[in-house]
């Protein structure tokens, strides 16, 4: 299935202090996220309330995208850096995604992208830069279904959305691709939360099964020593 999730907004954080800034606003350790990898993250307010739970894409050493469908996180992030303490830009960019989900998603993506990406060895939450119908896209192995799947983020989406859309439809013909709206019953079955429906800023991570996102005494990305918004309330 192809899901039209163009409602998801991409907030770009870019510049020399991008990593430092992102690490300050999320609960897990951003310094341990490699370029061309993504992660599911949460942002909390000073009281520990969950402000949003976006997918964070690390496009390069100094560039991150917060991919979110609800709330005004873009304005929040700009407010956090209103004093210019962090040397980075924060803006919503013209990049919109569609999701290819289901057991045939890998086969479809191979037909769509050819040898641009080694899909057999692409890790979960791995990213890749590709051209689709000659247009620049970022692909992530992720989705909202709990099944195998991918997200295609089209750059300059207001100009080239139709080109990418038609290319996916053409590649999907032999796979019997169906275009649907986001299937919430699938994400509910998979235990995937939706901010604004399952939790909001009135809930802390421990109240909605997201306590693992808080760095306490864990390892790796959970062994975070740096300060972050909400740390005093959560730890």
Regions found by a protein language model. Name each.
Residues 1-43, 49:
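Acidic, proline/glycine-enriched N-terminal capping motif
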Residues 47-48, 134:
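Detector for glycine-centered tight turns/loop "hinges" at secondary-structure junctions
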Residues 51-54:
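Short beta-strand and beta-hairpin "edge-sheet" elements
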Residues 57-235:
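Conserved, structured C-terminal
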């Amino acid at each position: 299935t192809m899901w039209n999730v163009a409602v998801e907004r991409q907030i770009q954080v870019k510049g020399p202090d991008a990593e430092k800034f992102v690490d300050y606003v999320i609960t897990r350790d951003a310094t341990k996220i490699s370029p061309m990898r993504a992660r599911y993250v949460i942002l909390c307010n000073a009281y520990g309330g969950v402000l949003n739970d976006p997918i964070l894409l690390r496009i390069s050493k100094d560039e991150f995208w917060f991919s979110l469908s609800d709330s005004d996180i873009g304005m929040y992030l700009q407010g956090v850096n209103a004093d210019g303490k962090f040397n980075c830009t924060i803006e919503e960019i013209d990049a919109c995604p569609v999701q290819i989900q289901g057991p045939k998603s890998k086969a479809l993506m191979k037909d769509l992208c050819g040898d641009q990406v080694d899909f057999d060895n692409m890790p979960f939450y791995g990213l890749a830069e590709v051209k689709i119908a000659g247009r620049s896209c970022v692909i992530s192995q992720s989705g909202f279904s709990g099944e195998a799947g991918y997200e295609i983020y089209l750059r300059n989406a207001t100009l080239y959305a139709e080109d990418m859309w038609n290319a996916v439809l053409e590649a999907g013909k032999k796979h019997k691709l169906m275009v649907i709206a986001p299937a919430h019953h699938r994400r509910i079955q998979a235990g995937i939360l939706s901010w604004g429906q399952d939790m909001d800023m009135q809930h802390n991570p421990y109240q909605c099964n997201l306590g693992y996102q808080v760095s306490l005494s864990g390892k790796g990305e959970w062994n975070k020593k740096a300060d972050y918004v909400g740390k005093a309330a959560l730890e």
